[in-house]
């Protein structure tokens, strides 16, 4: 494992200095699905890329999709991606204890089996305790756009995209050399500093940003009050360099990311009777992420284009429980270190068979590694050492056919054949369709009927298969015989737009069925009082519901979105709601830019209570409403520079927002808090040619 890790990190360091990939800049008309100029590799606001791995109009998508643009991200001003995603319809982010930086679970339409990619590469670590997404370490300043695709995406999206796909794209430079700087502060000991340089022309573009974000947390519990040791700080470094080649018909690009995040864990657990929680002064977690994406994309002819991509994602997750005088065992210490690596080599080739038919063929090679060890020291148990490692290899081939019938009926279908060294061979078909018609006798109005169906699989994480815990109070056993989860899902919906898309109403129904669902089973040994458990394929689950959304954008300076999602989820073994899933969720956000100087937004999120497990007597959190207000005001503007004042207020009404609950304690998110600061941008004047 160490040999593979050293090779991967060395390759990542080399790739950092090599330029990478561009997404095609297309006409947004429904009839044009081909790659076009690689000037900056941008995808337009009304286009989507991740659905077929090439840019196409959102109007043609047979699935339910949302696009969060750089403009939307900047308007919200939220530094953490998980908070931005929580404003999106049918997406729910559950923080494990309510404090920024704590482990988070992202669910879409009730399931946490969602795939997250950054620049096309999987961003979920193999050391997670369940397949899914942990977005708490991703900061938003370096993200250009976020694409949210609901429903099974196992064909083009690949493994672990059964519940949906969230695709993030890194910012790219354009225009003359520019410098951005911002400095912000707020209550709860919050500070945020950022510096970025960017620029680009038809030949070369570049972007590099450094962001440091820190907060004291603000979490509280019902039995301990405000948690004192709850700090979180995160350093992100991002570099994106692209070079056009072959008469601007090709693009070579490298995107590098580094993140170092520390989260203090202020809640400890007593090591002797009476067992319970206490204010821990020195426990913490430390997380490192390295990601590198190197790609080459080429429009060889008007009818054929392709891309080749290599991706590396390496994570080190460390947790430290340090000795103190409160726990009941003054020498008790537990140190856990897990290193995990994933490498991908992928390619997709798109053939324009006819003006109305685009055929895509792709291949993906993926290998994963995990290497973990723990050290547990106790007064009565002595020193207990534990180590584990494992790896898998997977090869995929897939085909996807996109048919356009007279710019009104759009049909997509295909399948992926996957072979995993541990889980065997399986096929995941997907199909979708969209029918777009002018509304009868109503100028500027369109009616869109959409539907999608698919099968997908979720591979167990390497931690679920190989990870072990061997401490004085708990033993978690490896289960190398775990099977992949299987899912089948379908949805239908209708979208009605008016006034040339200025007003849009969307309503849909979704239905999903899982089998071989992975759960955790265990028991307490009556002789030793040690809890013993492991991950097993025990459950089946079903999820169904409906979602509605209204989007109103009467003017470029005003945009409002409101959504409602009802989710009925059930563990068919216990006939109980799935954990962490709110039955009712209401969200709304308004962007208002009355002039060039002022930019304001307001957001609201209301969720019903959530069960913490599938047990009949499971604890349940309370309903909550969270309101946010923010904006940016331009103070000074010159020919080449601007200075702005920005600020945001969170949990405006100081609600007790319960994020997690046990039999003895309830964990609450921070009360009302704010952040404000200055943003400065300067563009280097271009030299004028002498006459």
Predicted feature residues:
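Extracytoplasmic beta-strand/coil segments of soluble accessory domains associated
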Residues: 57, 82-122
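Short acidic/polar hinge/loop motifs at secondary-structure boundaries
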Residues: 105, 122-150
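A beta-strand signature from Gram-negative outer-membrane beta-barrel systems
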Residues: 137-180
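Transmembrane beta-barrel wall of Gram-negative outer-membrane proteins
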Residues: 185-214, 224-264, 284-305, 353-359
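C-terminal beta-signal and adjacent terminal beta-strands/loops
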Residues: 218, 520, 555, 606-611, ...
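Surface-exposed extracellular loop regions of Gram-negative outer-membrane beta-barrel proteins
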Residues: 262, 267-273, 376, 421-427, ...
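Membrane-embedded beta-barrel scaffold of Gram-negative outer-membrane proteins
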Residues: 303-323, 367-371, 448-454, 458, ...
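Gram-negative outer-membrane beta-barrel transporters
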Residues: 404-411, 511-513, 530-614, 688
